[in-house]
Amino acid sequence: MTNIRKTHPLLKIINNSFVDLPTPSSLSSWWNFGSLLGVCLAVQIMTGLFLAMHYTSDTTTAFNSVTHICRDVNYGWLLRYLHANGASMFFICLYLHVGRGLYYGSYTYLETWNIGIILLFAVMATAFMGYVLPWGQMSFWGATVITNLLSAIPYIGTELVQWIWGGFSVDKATLTRFFAFHFLLPFIISALVMVHLLFLHETGSNNPTGIPSNSDMIPFHPYYTIKDILGFLIMLTTLSLLVLFSPDLLGDPDNYIPANPLNTPPHIKPEWYFLFAYAILRSIPNKLGGVLALVLSILILAIIPMLHTSKQRSMMFRPTSQFLFWLLVADLLTLTWIGGQPVEYPYIMIGQVASILYFLTILILMPLISTMENQMLKW
């Protein structure tokens, strides 16, 4: 008798995706982050669901409802901090996952890559709207500053901003709709994840060498299920340590002050995972230029497949390209640091240099070095 997992209509899909899936035998730990992102999404949806049961999306009670969750709800503090720090873990895994794709040339799977970019935007939008919900000072002013950027769009900018706000400033209508979208988007993300996996399983996984591995495949289970479980344990341990020992390490103390439209905080800044993009935005003196640079800093990922000039897929055997890749990583870390600093000398200048270097590395230096490597190998 054939095993039920191979014949049952529903189990067959799961089997072909997670059990009998032919997988390259050489995958390193860098391939763990996809499954870790799945765990992050599950944790966020579960904790978020329970938080939503006690949260009220009204400007007069939102801040107090979060306080109530932390003080009066059984393990409410745990739910709240798991959700807040879970978002940080989500973005750490997300950036490492994208970085892996860049390093090993996974972007040549165009459909998978493009759905991944849409997912990145969706997760960023969800996180931004979630940060507004506690209705602290940074929630309110962060929402005001970021939504106000849309007013830089010619002709329709002002109307667009007021349409999003649902009034003439960030207020009750804004908070209510942000809560609605923050609740809805994770389920849309879940659907997109399935499409992402669907496209990935059409082509099969890439591997560290970048060379087709059709002749050397192993089943996903038990080899990679065990490997993924180790990843889960490491990530969940890290998250637990963060939540239980320093839950506010990555947050902003200003968000413990209730939102006050009459009092602007000295330094308005988003959560740490958006600081690199915020630094790029601030480094351009023109409002519209800054907004375009902000969007392009992420959207640039979409044109990376077109900029691939190397005859090799992966950077594994390309030391010069590796140097540029790590230069880009260092540049992004510099931008993250700058995004959290006040707008004054020398931070403005460092931010401008780092922003130029970011676009220069991706658009010009990487394709140029790849072509040079081809020449050196007489290809």
From Swiss-Prot:
What domain of life does the native source organism fall in?
Eukaryota
- What are the recorded Gene Ontology BP terms? mitochondrial electron transport, ubiquinol to cytochrome c
Q: Extract the GO molecular function terms from the UniProt entry.
A: metal ion binding; ubiquinol-cytochrome-c reductase activity
Tell me where it mainly resides: mitochondrion
Positions of heme b b562 binding: 83, 182
What are the subcellular locations of this protein? Mitochondrion inner membrane
Q: Which residues cross the membrane?
A: 33-53, 77-98, 113-133, 178-198, 226-246, 288-308, 320-340, 347-367
Whether Oxidoreductase counts among this entry's keywords is no
Protein residues bound to a ubiquinone: 201
Query: Single GO cellular component annotation?
Result: mitochondrial inner membrane
Does the record bear Metal-binding in its keywords? yes
* Cofactor(s) named in the record: heme b
Q: How does the protein's chain sit in the membrane according to the entry? A: Multi-pass membrane protein
Q: Give the cofactor note text.
A: Binds 2 heme b groups non-covalently.
Extract the SUPFAM superfamilies matched here.
a domain/subunit of cytochrome bc1 complex (Ubiquinol-cytochrome c reductase), Transmembrane di-heme cytochromes
Which PROSITE patterns has this protein been placed in? CYTB_CTER, CYTB_NTER
Q: Which residues bind heme b b566?
A: 97, 196
- What keywords appear on the UniProt entry? Electron transport, Heme, Iron, Membrane, Metal-binding, Mitochondrion, Mitochondrion inner membrane, Respiratory chain, Transmembrane, Transmembrane helix, Transport, Ubiquinone
Q: Name one Pfam family in it.
A: Cytochrome_B
Q: Self-association or partners: how does it assemble? A: The cytochrome bc1 complex contains 11 subunits: 3 respiratory subunits (MT-CYB, CYC1 and UQCRFS1), 2 core proteins (UQCRC1 and UQCRC2) and 6 low-molecular weight proteins (UQCRH/QCR6, UQCRB/QCR7, UQCRQ/QCR8, UQCR10/QCR9, UQCR11/QCR10 and a cleavage product of UQCRFS1). This cytochrome bc1 complex then forms a dimer.
Give the protein family: Belongs to the cytochrome b family.
Note the PANTHER family from the entry. CYTOCHROME B
Q: Any extra remark in the record?
A: Heme 1 (or BL or b562) is low-potential and absorbs at about 562 nm, and heme 2 (or BH or b566) is high-potential and absorbs at about 566 nm.
Q: What does this protein do?
A: Component of the ubiquinol-cytochrome c reductase complex (complex III or cytochrome b-c1 complex) that is part of the mitochondrial respiratory chain. The b-c1 complex mediates electron transfer from ubiquinol to cytochrome c. Contributes to the generation of a proton gradient across the mitochondrial membrane that is then used for ATP synthesis.
Protein's UniProt name: Cytochrome b
